[in-house]
């Protein structure tokens, strides 16, 4: 179901959104001091007009959501959602047909990628759209697009943006590497011919700052940068480091303020280029410098979500019952972690989003009302108020839609579900045995084609 109002975003519209958010931020800062009942309602964000697929990738402290949606011709557009409205960022002046929005900060700056209108001379698939066009990273705010420079190669992409406007991502160099997969490999990567490096585009700057890989590694990718300027991601060899959407590397890495890499360790395994998505990668870091991600277990057949701190090192978070793989994709400043737990192969298995809090991993579906129309599939982001952004399957339309899950006790007005008589997984086990839902094969193929971050 599309939202009631959908339009191309304008400067005036976004300024109005930001003005409306001022009081919301003040209210939520006061409300965030109070403990809430950990149960949620879920808001289906819908799609852009004519679209059948959308996903949310980031969420601010006042509920502004960034992501991507298909449109009527089947192409993908970077999008924003706020208070019942959908805004089409499109492919902002970059010439291509497809784009996506990933990270978003409190100033409504969006980090994204767009196809250009130029064919990649190596016919690589860096953006993941399968068109063979060059992939261009950008920073966008209030209708203005900043094209981000590369490292001498043809392609780059981004993953996140902090509140200082620093963008984390990856950019190709001009160096050919015979270790790169020259054809589409079993792990879903390729064809890739050039090395790529983790980079940061500092706020207001177009030129990237290279983040060197660990000694012995040749490539890297930066997935998150916090407000302290610390970045996390992965490094490895071009043969065992997988680009998004199923990113993994030989080593999960933290880069300090000087750009020096630090190995975060592993849970017993290393990268496995023979199995999609299996390896080590740090996906996010909060402002306490605590890191979440996924690490290969001994035997290199499965990944498990982890939380890393300087004091504890890498600690496994587990998987949901019956699942074989998991990954922590985001962490807020309260160390609440969201991500995905998967039954089967990372690419083809059934995904189940989770919320991990105080040592307990809960299926997100058990925290929602039983009559929720959208079945959540993956949780990509969480803000400090506990609002969770992701995407789910809508059985009535057979479509996949972005969602925002809102916790009880904050701005949630669902008095019946949020009353003390109904508790979810973290209280009484209301709905805890709700069956997991397998996706139709057609939608599974769509997810494989579009990928996710």
Question: In which residue ranges do the predicted regions lie?
Answer:
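Residue-level hotspots at or immediately adjacent to binding/recognition sites across diverse folds
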Residues: 2-7, 11, 17-453
């Amino acid at each position: 179901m599309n939202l009631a109002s959908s339009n191309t975003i304008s400067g005036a519209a976004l300024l109005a959104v930001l003005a409306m958010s001022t009081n919301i931020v003040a209210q939520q800062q006061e409300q965030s001091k109070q403990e809430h009942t950990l149960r949620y309602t879920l808001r289906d964000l819908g799609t852009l007009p004519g679209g059948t697929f959308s996903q949310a990738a980031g969420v601010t402290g006042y509920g502004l959501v960034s992501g991507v949606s298909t449109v009527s011709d089947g192409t993908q557009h970077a999008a924003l959602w706020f208070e019942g409205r959908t805004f089409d960022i499109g492919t902002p002046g970059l010439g291509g047909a497809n784009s996506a929005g990933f990270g978003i900060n409190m100033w409504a700056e969006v980090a994204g990628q767009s196809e250009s209108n130029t064919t990649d001379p190596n016919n690589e698939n860096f953006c993941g759209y399968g068109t063979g066009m060059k992939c261009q990273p950008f920073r966008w705010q209030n209708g203005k697009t900043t094209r981000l420079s590369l490292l001498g190669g043809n392609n780059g992409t981004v993953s996140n943006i902090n509140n200082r406007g620093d963008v984390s991502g990856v950019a190709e160099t001009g160096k050919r590497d015979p270790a790169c997969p020259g054809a589409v490999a079993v792990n879903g990567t390729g064809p890739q011919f050039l090395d790529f490096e983790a980079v940061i585009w500092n706020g207001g700057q177009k030129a990237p700052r290279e983040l060197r890989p660990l000694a012995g590694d040749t490539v890297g990718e930066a997935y998150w940068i916090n407000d302290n300027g610390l970045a996390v991601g992965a490094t490895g060899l071009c043969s065992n480091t997988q680009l998004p959407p199923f990113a993994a590397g030989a080593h999960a890495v933290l880069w300090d303020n000087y750009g020096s890499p630090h190995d975060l360790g592993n849970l017993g395994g290393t990268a496995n280029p023979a199995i999609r998505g299996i390896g080590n990668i740090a996906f996010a870091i909060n402002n306490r410098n605590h890191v979440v991600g996924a690490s290969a277990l001994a035997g290199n057949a499965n990944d498990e979500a982890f939380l890393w701190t300087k004091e504890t090192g890498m600690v496994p978070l587990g998987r949901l019952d019956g699942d074989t793989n998991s990954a922590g994709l985001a962490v807020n400043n309260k160390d609440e972690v969201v991500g995905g737990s998967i039954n089967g192969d990372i690419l083809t298995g059934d995904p189940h989003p989770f919320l991990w809090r105080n040592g307990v991993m809960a299926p997100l579906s058990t925290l929602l009302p039983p009559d929720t129309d959208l079945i959540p599939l993956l949780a990509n982001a969480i803000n400090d108020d506990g609002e969770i952004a992701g995407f789910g399957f809508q059985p009535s339309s057979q479509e996949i839609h972005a969602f925002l899950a809102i916790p009880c006790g904050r701005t949630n007005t669902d008095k019946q579900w949020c009353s003390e008589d109904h508790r979810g997984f973290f209280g009484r086990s209301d709905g805890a045995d709700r069956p997991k839902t397998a996706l139709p094969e057609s939608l599974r193929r769509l997810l494989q084609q579009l990928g996710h971050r």
